[in-house]
Structure formats: C-alpha cells, structure tokens
Amino acid sequence: WVREADVDGYRCDVAGLVPTDFWDEARPALDALKPVFMLAEWDELYPSGGLTWEEFNSETQLLERAFNMTFGLRLHYLLDHLAEGKAQLADIDEYLAAERAKYPPSVYLMHFTSNHDVNSWDGTEYERLGPLALPFAVLTALLPGMPLLYSGQEAALNKRLAFFERDPIDWQDFPLQDFYTKLFQLKKRHPALRNGDPGSRFQRLAGPAGLYGFVREKNGSAVVVLINATAEPLELPGQKTAINPQKGLFDVFSGEQLTLAQAKARTVPAHGYRVLRTRD
C-alpha cells in the first residue's frame, strides 16, 4: 500500500488486541519506505474492542513507539453522558487530568462527535447530542487533541449510514461547511492550538456549572472557548486570564472585533458557543 498506492498512514482496528511487539516492529519497517501516520483504534483510558473494565488492558503502550495517536473514546462517551444528563461539565476536567497523568504533553488523542461505528450503531450526533451537537464539535476541535470530521458532517448528515452496504450521502448545499472551515482553519493556524506542544498553556475558566470555558495561550496569542450546555444564556466568567487586556479580540464565528471588556459583557447563547482569539 505504501509503495504502490502511496498511502500516508493507517487506521488500525482494535490495535490493543494485537501484541504491541508486532506494531513496534511494523512501524519502522513502514517508515523505512515512507514516513507514515499511525492511528490506533484504541484508548488506553477506556475499554475498547467490546471489552469490560475487568478484561481491559490499559498498559498496551501503543504510543511509546508504534502509533502517533489513539482514539479518545473516554471523552466521546463522556460527551454522550453529558447530553443525556448523566454527567457534569466538570467531569471533563477529570478526563483531562487523567490524560495528562498518563501521557506527556507531546502525546495527543483523537476527539470526535461521530465516526463510522458511532453513526451506524449508536446514532448520529443529532440523535445522541441533540442541541449540543455543534457546541461539542467546537469542544472536540479546540481541546488539546486532534479533531476528526466524519463523512457528511459538513452536510449536517442526520441519518445512520448503512454499515455494510452502499449508502450515498445527501450533501445538500454543505450547510455546515462554513462552520467547520472556520473551526479547522483556527485549529490549523493558531500557535496555541498545535498538537503535542508543551509550550501551549491551558487555563480553565471558572463559571456557572452549565458553562465550560478555557483559554489556550502561547507567546501572548490566545484562544478563548466557551460552551453553554444549558437552555438559558449564560454570562462569561469575569476572572483574570492569560489574555493581554491591551489586545483586542476577534469572534471567530461572527467576525466581530471586540475589546476584552466588550467580550466579557456578552453572553453565551443557550446550547451555544463562543470562540474568541486575540487580534494580531
């Protein structure tokens, strides 16, 4: 596949059920042909492959030598539980702490609101997350990690695709193309959002229980992310942040230019989000 099709990476199914020694030997053999990106369908923080907690091995060490990234299944299921009212936004902090306790800052996981398994077997993001589908898309893209966009999400796909048969996607007029373009351009271009960068700071913002806010900052450039999981508008937290008050802010989705004081005076809409970045 590397020699003839020039593939640049592999997504390896239930990688943790294969002996890690195999992957550790396979990776340098592939890299000798061409540097590849290796993604493991596995999460060392959450049971994968249909295993129970008792059967699960969290010490597969797939990210030591063989793989660049694993799935972030623990966060995925946490977001589902949040939408169901079975978890609190503060539980995200516990997840991030567990991730950092296990891995150095250079390691990052893949986060998502849908993928081929989830869409077909568990339901679309609109079935599972309801009005939080887009706020949680913002969250999975801008928390530390690598975001995944599944087929049809930019077209607001709202049906379960057949798993083993051809099932064409109705692309419509790509209603969410602008949303995902702005989101991923920010992710790609902003220095504070780079994957596995130990120089990027993460600051959690205090606020009401239904608001999850954080700042990511590097060398004076910052991104503010605010997620409102409630049915009521919420005010922005007023605490001191890493943002230089002399710098103006740019609302990534509305295009507004604001002062820090103006930004703090705004609310986050019900089941909504706001993403601000410092102006250059």
PLM segments and residue spans:
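An active-site-proximal structural segment forming one wall of the substrate-binding cleft
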Residues: W1-D8
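Short, solvent-exposed loop/turn segments at secondary-structure junctions
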Residues: D8, G16-P19, D43-Y46, N115-N119, ...
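Aromatic/acidic polysaccharide-binding cleft in carbohydrate-active enzymes
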Residues: V107-F174
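Carbohydrate-binding surface patches
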Residues: R204-A242
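C-terminal beta-strand-rich structural cap/linker in extracellular carbohydrate-active enzymes
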Residues: L260-D280
